[in-house]
């Protein structure tokens, strides 16, 4: 329905008055509650689709052209101030065609950071300065001397919808986080909320953290977010969110992570490729409320696959990149071996719900085809506030992301099952073999003759033909070999396995889904 111009003016006059009241207070009083008031106001009104003001030369450009538009590093925000952080901005272009408002919060005021084309070097992109002078930014990035005290490196990028990416020391960008996911993988189609406005607190010279506030908006939800960014060897952000639904949603994804898995050791490439593995993440890790650790290796299935792990008050979950030897990837350009894992640690009790994993078929590495989030069993009524707090850590230290007394899966290898004959020649027997290597800080200290055994199971669509365990001296762990026979290849097959020593559980649970048509 088209709104009359005067109605729109009156509505935004009310928002302007609200903003004036908010900004009248000093910076130390600015909080997530100020942003929440705006989110509540938006939730009480009908959604207005943001309008693009982008000239066609920018809207229709290809990725290579967009890459030519580079921020002028000499004009980084706070460049002339003694702060540990600097800001740079993204220009609009391609599908980044809607401006976001970016504000600076100081000790005495809140003011908008104005767009100017002078911030950017446009390369060979022809443009009229008069048509771009009031465009606004597509997003921003944060810089910090995380690798060297004399050089500022990018540590955070906020660009597109509610996506953001972070990296710690020695890491390169890989998977992304999001503010909120709505109706992911449902037949009705996914809704992508977007951060429409940011408030960034100017850091003091001695600050080791940066505080960012964000206002989220979408047709059926609004939200207020507070991010406390803490860069180090790993980078950590404390997230606080206040979410308000405008209308009913089918599925609400809290603390969503988005990644890519094309092929790997458990799901080899269908074509010959010099890279043995190609992925930003290779598994979903879950620390359930009952203490169980679960590892689900990722797949690139031929059909959409949705897995749900019921867990009340989860202790943590994340999409991890396990196994960082360069030889596993052999990619000098994209350095998948340096891409971080992302781990969510909930704060407080989230209640009853599930960690959900969505695997989407893809033919190339440019498509993010993996999504993971926690979704509550019961959704709130429209307008009612729901709160979630959690810590998000991006790390290359997989030992740090797992309990020291619980062994974890280092790798899952898949092979054609076979039997060694009396003449020592291996003969395929129609089975599929999985070789799973377990290791861990406590497991490495176990004597080699420890009687480690496996507890393994498979659903009604398969039979376990072999389950054997042997010590692996290379990793100071144990290797489990499973050979399984699938009854109907057009159906999904579920398997589970863990290592034990008598009644003592030694490892996490390997929870594998063999996709249909494999």
From Swiss-Prot:
Which subcellular locations apply to this protein?
Periplasm
Know the name of this protein? Glucans biosynthesis protein G
The pathway is:
Glycan metabolism; osmoregulated periplasmic glucan (OPG) biosynthesis
Superkingdom, taxonomy of origin = Bacteria
Role this protein plays: Involved in the biosynthesis of osmoregulated periplasmic glucans (OPGs).
What would you give as a GO molecular function for this chain, any one?
Answer: catalytic activity
One GO biological process term: beta-glucan biosynthetic process
Q: Where are the transmembrane segments?
A: none
Give the signal peptide range: 1-29
Return any one Pfam family short name.
MdoG
Keywords attached to this entry: Periplasm, Signal
Principal place of residence = periplasm
Q: Which family does it belong to?
A: Belongs to the OpgD/OpgG family.
- GO cellular component terms, A-Z: outer membrane-bounded periplasmic space
InterPro entries in UniProt: Gal_mutarotase_sf_dom (IPR011013), GH-type_carb-bd (IPR014718), Glucan_biosyn_MdoG/MdoD (IPR014438), Glucan_biosyn_MdoG_C (IPR007444), Ig-like_fold (IPR013783), Ig_E-set (IPR014756), MdoG_OpgG (IPR023704)
């Amino acid at each position: 329905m088209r709104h009359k111009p005067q109605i729109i003016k009156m509505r935004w006059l009310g928002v302007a008055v609200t903003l004036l009241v908010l900004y009248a207070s000093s910076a130390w009083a600015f909080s997530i509650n100020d942003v929440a008031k705006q989110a509540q106001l938006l939730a009480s009104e009908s959604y207005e689709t943001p309008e693009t003001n982008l000239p066609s030369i920018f809207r229709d450009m290809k990725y290579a052209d967009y890459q030519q538009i580079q921020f002028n590093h000499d004009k980084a925000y706070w460049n002339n101030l003694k702060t540990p952080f600097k800001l740079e901005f993204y220009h609009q272009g391609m599908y980044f065609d809607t401006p976001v408002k970016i504000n600076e919060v100081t000790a005495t005021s809140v003011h908008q950071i104005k767009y100017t084309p002078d911030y950017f070097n446009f390369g060979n992109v022809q443009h009229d300065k008069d048509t771009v002078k009031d465009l606004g930014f597509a997003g921003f990035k944060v810089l910090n001397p995380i690798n060297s005290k004399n050089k500022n490196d990018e540590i955070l990028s906020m660009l597109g919808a509610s996506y953001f990416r972070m990296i710690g020391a020695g890491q390169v960008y890989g998977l992304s986080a999001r503010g909120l996911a709505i109706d992911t993988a449902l037949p009705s189609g996914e809704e992508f909320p977007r951060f429409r406005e940011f408030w960034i607190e100017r850091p003091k010279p001695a600050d080791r953290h940066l505080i960012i506030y964000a206002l989220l908006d979408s047709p059926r939800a609004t939200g207020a977010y507070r991010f406390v960014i803490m860069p180090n060897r790993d980078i950590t952000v404390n997230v606080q969110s206040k979410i308000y639904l405008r209308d009913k949603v089918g599925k609400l994804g809290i603390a969503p992570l988005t990644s890519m898995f094309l092929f790997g050791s458990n799901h080899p490439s269908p074509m010959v490729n010099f890279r043995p593995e190609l992925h930003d993440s290779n598994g979903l890790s879950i620390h359930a409320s009952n203490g169980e650790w679960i590892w689900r290796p990722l797949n690139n299935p031929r059909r959409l696959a949705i897995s749900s792990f019921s867990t009340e008050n989860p202790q943590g979950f994340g999409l991890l990149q396990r196994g960082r030897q360069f030889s596993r990837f052999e990619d000098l350009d994209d350095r998948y071996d340096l891409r971080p894992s992302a781990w969510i640690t909930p704060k407080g009790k989230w209640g009853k719900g599930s960690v959900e994993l969505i695997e989407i078929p893809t033919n190339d590495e440019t498509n993010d085809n993996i999504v993971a989030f926690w979704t509550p069993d019961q959704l709130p009524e429209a307008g009612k506030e729901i709160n979630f707090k959690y810590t998000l850590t991006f790390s290359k230290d997989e030992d740090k992301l797992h309990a020291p007394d619980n062994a974890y899966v280092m790798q899952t290898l898949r092979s054609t099952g076979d039997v060694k004959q009396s003449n020592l020649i291996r003969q395929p027997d129609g089975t599929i073999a999985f070789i799973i290597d377990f290791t861990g800080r406590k497991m490495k200290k176990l004597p080699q003759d420890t009687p480690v055994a496996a507890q393994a199971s498979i659903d009604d669509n398969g039979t376990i033909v072999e389950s054997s365990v042997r010590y692996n001296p290379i990793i100071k762990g144990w290797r489990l070999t499973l050979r399984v026979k699938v009854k109907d290849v057009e159906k999904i097959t579920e398997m589970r396995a863990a290592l034990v020593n008598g009644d003592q559980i030694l490892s996490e649970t390997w929870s594998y889904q063999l996709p249909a048509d494999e």
